[in-house]
Amino acid sequence: LFCSDDPDLIFPWWSFSKTVLATAALRLVGKGKLELDQRLPDRQFTLRQLLQHQAGAPNYSKLAAYTRAVEERADPWDVEDMLDQCHAAQPEYMPGSGWAYSNTGYLIVRCLIERAANDDLGSALQFLVFDPLEIDSVFLAKTRQDMARAVWGNENGYHPGWVYHGLLLGTAGDAVRFLNGLMTRDILSATLHEQMISPHHIGGPVSGRPWQKTAYGLGLMCGEMNSVGRSIGHSGGGPENVCAVYHFPDVQEPVTVAAFCSGSDEGVAENEVVELVV
């Protein structure tokens, strides 16, 4: 766990970025610029299925070649090359009939947001999500130099382009402010908010992690953790550090907590947020 009194320290948000993308996509649904349950043109799946990891999109981060390339500090592949390597045109299962976590699916979500907003991702997220919540520390990492602004630096030369859906960096406080705002303010309509947190149940306890029930909403991990009940947010990780940002609505005084830790075990950050609450 990284402990500091400096509120301006920058951390990689890793897959917590997915929650921001999902929020932006649902804001566009609310504005009538995207459809949640209509099949996408020339695709077999819907936006809802992408957000809930039920579209069958093959996950590029499972590729051995991807792992080697990241370890070798290589530049990211071109998007088309990545899609070819993971056979993205061939769904792993019929959309809606299964569940499998997919970073590739969220690249498609990114493309949908940029097209519907007629803007680049960073600008779209600022306008759709961060401005309404008065959040100003968050930015989209595009270069190795951007990664070096984070508290741990970037000695391993990691390129954020490997997170094809977009890797956000920001303060721990703004991670909490974003998720707390999403959970307690009206940034989404009541109907869309309810759909976002509605869980697709996945399984039971996970060894080394605090989960008792695992589930996924629309861009949200939303199962139950030891001692705190419902746990709504997202964990994430990359080379050498991990994060967990969660809202706990069932504790006596509902609270939102974030933990950013060195290492590669997301369970460490998840256990830390539980400890901070109980």
Language-model segment annotations:
Residues 1, 67-94, 119-141, 146-152:
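Short, charged, amphipathic alpha-helices and their helix-cap/turn boundaries
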Residues 14-34, 50, 86-87, 100-129, ...:
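Alpha-helical scaffold elements that line and support the substrate/ligand-binding pocket
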Residues 23, 54-57, 89-90, 128, ...:
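Alpha-helix boundary/capping residues
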Residues 27-44, 116-144, 189-194:
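Short, well-structured active-site flanking segments
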Residues 55-62, 132-142, 201-208:
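Secretory-pathway/luminal and periplasmic proteins that interact with or process carbohydrate-rich
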Residues 74, 97-105, 117, 160, ...:
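Short, contiguous, pocket-lining structural segments
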